[in-house]
Structures are given as C-alpha cells and as structure tokens.
Regions:
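Beta-rich accessory regions
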Residues: 1-155
Length: 155
C-alpha cells in the first residue's frame, strides 16, 4: 500500500519502489484542489529520466498517458508518444485504476467508460511509482498498489 492519503502542495512529488514490474494501482479519489497538473509516474527509473506519466490537466480537462520517456521509443517514427482524452472531473475528483506490467500500461476511469492502453519499453530496473502535483495542490486518497502475480511463475 502506497498511502491512505497523499496530499501534495506546489511542485512536489513522492516516490516508492515497487517490488517488481507487475502492479495494480487504484486511486479512488484524486482531488485536484488547485494543481494545474497532477498524476503519477509508473515504471520510473531511480534518476527520474525514465517513466510513463499519467496525469490530469485541469485547464484542458484532459487525462494524458505520456510515454515519451518510457524507455526504448526510437524503434519507429510512427510511435505515438501521448494519448490524450477529454475527461471532465466529477465533483473535482478523478478515480483511476491503472494496471502496469513489464511492457504495458492500462488506465481506466469513469467506471471503465474511458480506457487508455499503451505498450512501454522500460528497463527491468525501472520499477518506481511516483505521484506529483504542478503549480498547486492535489490530494491522492485511498491509493493502493497491489502486486500482481507473475504469469511466468510456476504455481
């Protein structure tokens, strides 16, 4: 479990290392009090150079999955770096469910009405999860990280 409630003020972030690259993260109530942009970074590197950013922009009312720094992205000029969806907040809150494994990220919101699915190519050691808020405050509450079973492991 990452945190029951994680308030962030100003330009700030918090980072936790996941035990492996398989994970399930839910944030039942992400409240964007005054932050211009807030979200989480999955499959991040220790130095912060690599990571897949999932964030909400309050001005444009959009949810973005940005994989422009998600590891090896130079294999094709057709590689799309960002996927952006219009997603108005409900009562100032956004509920996300994020599934992450070795090479994919799936983001569910709106009770499954909106889904973003992308492939990512980080190094095996890029296994950190961070939350951040830019230019204001955001609260991540009821946030949990659950380790999923490795499908290659013998049962």
């Amino acid at each position: 479990m990452l945190a029951r409630q994680t308030p962030l003020h100003g330009d700030h972030s918090r980072q936790n290392q996941c035990p492996n690259s398989f994970g399930h993260c839910t944030s039942d109530k992400s409240i964007y009090d005054s932050a211009q942009r807030a979200g989480l970074i999955v499959r991040g590197s220790a130095n912060g150079d690599v990571g897949t950013w999932i964030f909400y922009d309050t001005a444009s009312q959009t949810l973005t999955l940005d994989r422009s720094r998600s590891g090896n992205i130079r294999f094709s000029n057709a590689f799309s770096k960002q996927h952006i969806v219009y997603m108005p907040l409900e009562n100032g809150k956004l509920r996300l469910t994020v599934l992450v494994d070795r090479n994919s990220v799936e983001v569910f919101t709106g009770d499954g009405r909106t889904v973003i699915t992308d492939l990512i190519f980080p190094a095996p050691d890029d296994n950190r999860v961070s939350v951040f808020a830019d230019n204001g405050e955001a609260t991540f509450s009821d946030m949990t990280i659950t380790r999923l079973a490795d499908p290659r492991a013998k049962q």
